[in-house]
């Protein structure tokens, strides 16, 4: 879930970690704290031209496994293990 996360300076990373720890010390779960801080960072860097473009999981929902391999590529189950005794 790093879609659209910008590259952060060391100082920005430290600030993010401190905010996450602060939220957790107040009783928030680590997942919630990370999600909240990530959303804040995305909002601050919304129009940042250096923000990395990373694909979301749903970008691949319309594709099947066969879309990502060649037709002549064998299934893992069909490959005989040549190194077995």
Curated annotation (Swiss-Prot):
Origin organism lineage: Bacteria, Pseudomonadati, Pseudomonadota, Gammaproteobacteria, Enterobacterales
Protein family per UniProt: Belongs to the UPF0181 family.
Region span, Disordered: 57-85
Pfam families tied to this protein: UPF0181
Compositionally biased intervals (Acidic residues): 73-85
Basic and acidic residues: compositionally biased ranges: 57-72
Protein name stated in the entry: UPF0181 protein YPTS_1774
InterPro entries: UPF0181
């Amino acid at each position: 879930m790093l879609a659209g996360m910008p590259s952060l300076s060391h100082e920005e990373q430290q600030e993010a970690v401190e905010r996450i720890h602060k939220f957790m010390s107040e009783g928030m779960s680590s997942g919630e704290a990370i999600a909240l801080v990530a959303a804040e960072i995305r909002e601050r860097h919304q129009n940042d031209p250096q923000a990395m473009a990373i694909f979301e999981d749903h970008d691949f929902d319309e594709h099947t496994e066969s879309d990502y391999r060649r037709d002549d590529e064998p299934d893992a189950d069909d490959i005989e293990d040549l190194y077995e005794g």
